[in-house]
């Protein structure tokens, strides 16, 4: 089970006890925000893409949307999201629980600047009913992200 892989991974950092599991689904931004009790923008949604360099996870704020022009400028190609089957095959996490943790070595992770507005954010932990509260610094470390990128739009910078 994917959440167990994430839990084992978090043990290395002493964070395994911080995973929250819910009776209800947290598979979408709205459901996760309700389960956690925060505004949707504070949910760190993980989107999976296939690039010429291989699979990639891009983590954005819950209110952010991919800006195709910015994406192409940063990554040099059009955004191509993974199908649910490919997301599971490449990341080990099913859609609804995709997260930037406990990933195969070939999966690159990038964090969008839309997350930096908040002192803490809530990414999933490998299942459709889990989350963890992390600072952006913790998210950067635990996700082993390669860099911060600016590839989103439609987010409210005043939140």
Provide a role label for each language-model segment.
Residues 1-159:
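Extended, low-hydrophobicity, polar/charged segments
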């Amino acid at each position: 089970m994917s959440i167990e892989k994430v839990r084992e991974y978090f043990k290395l950092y002493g964070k395994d006890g911080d995973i929250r599991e819910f009776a209800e689904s947290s598979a979408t931004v709205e459901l996760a925000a309700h389960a956690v009790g925060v505004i949707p923008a504070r949910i760190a949604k993980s989107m999976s893409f296939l690039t010429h360099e291989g699979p990639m996870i891009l983590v954005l704020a819950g209110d952010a949307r991919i800006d195709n022009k910015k994406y192409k400028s940063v990554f040099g190609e059009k955004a191509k999201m993974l199908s649910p089957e490919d997301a599971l095959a490449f990341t080990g996490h099913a859609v609804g629980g995709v997260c930037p943790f406990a990933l195969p070595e070939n999966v690159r992770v990038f964090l969008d600047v839309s997350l930096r507005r908040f002192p803490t954010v809530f990414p999933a932990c490998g299942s459709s009913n889990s989350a963890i509260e992390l600072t952006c610094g913790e998210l950067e470390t635990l996700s082993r992200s390669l860099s911060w990128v600016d590839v989103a739009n439609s987010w409210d910078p005043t939140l």
